[in-house]
Design a protein with these regions (language model features):
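Ankyrin repeat (ANK) tandem arrays and their immediately adjacent linkers/low-complexity segments
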Residues: 1-280
Length: 280
């Protein structure tokens, strides 16, 4: 419908009366699908007499890019950045803003975890530098929606003892050069060298790929391994210097890094928060 209106000459910068949102704002606020934002931008490219202010802020001060980041839509983030969204004035959304995009049942959720990591990856690839406040917002999302993995989640049932599941994991490709089986056996510090978070996000969106694991009762364990492993580097890198400060720099950074490698993400989160409280 929006595409038809734009083709008929509707002003793409005109805000909807009841929402104070332009069509682009409305798309980005109400959908997480890449093609919806892409439709608007495609029409603007075809009809050069119409000018779209892609960096326009709505009455709440939000740009379309800030909307789709809060909706955990990395595909749409990339579409907007490809078409001129300005990162120099980008404001990372506050924690409550993510409520629009995070629909959680209060447990480990591979879609939310991969969405958070993929959005951050998209922003950083284009030059955005996360602040400590941004990192804390992301960690708080993990805590708020109970995305942290417990050690018990990683232990039972043991999928590696199940021949059919192991065979499936070897055949299931996460990327052109990496199988699910190989990914599950990588160390956390090796993961980001072999797979992008965008690839992880696309895998998480596929309802069919985890169906075999679900039927055999191994989905929860495998998902726990993936979520903990792929988000580990984010938590570890942000906790390294705060932990160093907490111990008053009594160990070299290399030693601190070795210690943190053995911690769970939830432990790293609490360390990060504690360090922030003591420094304030």
């Amino acid at each position: 419908m929006i595409e038809q209106l734009l083709r008929r000459g509707a002003d793409p910068n005109l805000a909807k009366k009841h929402y104070d949102l332009t069509p682009l704002h409305f798309n980005c606020a109400m959908s997480s699908e890449k093609y919806l934002a892409g439709v608007v931008l495609k029409i603007m490219n075809e009809d050069s007499h119409q000018i779209m202010s892609i960096n326009m802020r709505d009455r709440y001060g939000r740009t379309p890019l800030e909307w789709v980041v809060a909706r955990l839509s990395p595909n749409t983030v990339n579409v907007l950045l490809d078409h001129g969204a300005d990162l120099s004035n980008f404001v990372f959304p506050k924690e409550r803003r993510f409520d629009y995009g995070v629909k959680s049942n209060g447990g480990i959720n591979i879609k939310i975890t991969s969405g958070i990591l993929a959005v951050v990856e998209s922003l950083e690839t284009r030059g955005y530098e996360l602040s400590r406040s941004d990192a804390l917002t992301i960690m708080n999302l993990f805590a708020k929606h109970k995305l942290f993995v417990k050690r018990a989640d990683l232990e039972e049932p043991n999928w590696q003892d199940h021949e059919e599941v192991t065979s499936f994991a070897k055949e299931m490709m996460i990327s052109p050069s990496l199988s699910l089986y190989d990914l599950l056996h990588l160390q956390p510090d090796e993961v980001t060298k072999r797979i992008t978070f965008k690839e992880f996000f696309e895998f998480a969106r596929s309802k069919k790929k985890l169906s075999t694991l679900r039927k055999k009762g191994f989905e929860a364990c495998v998902v726990a391994h993936l979520c903990e492993k792929l988000s580990r580097r984010f938590f570890q890198s942000w906790t390294l210097y705060p932990f160093w400060d907490l111990i008053h720099k009594r160990l070299p950074l290399e030693g601190c890094d070795m210690i943190l490698k053995n911690a769970m993400n939830e432990d790293l989160y609490h360390t990060f928060v504690t360090a922030g409280e003591r420094s304030s």
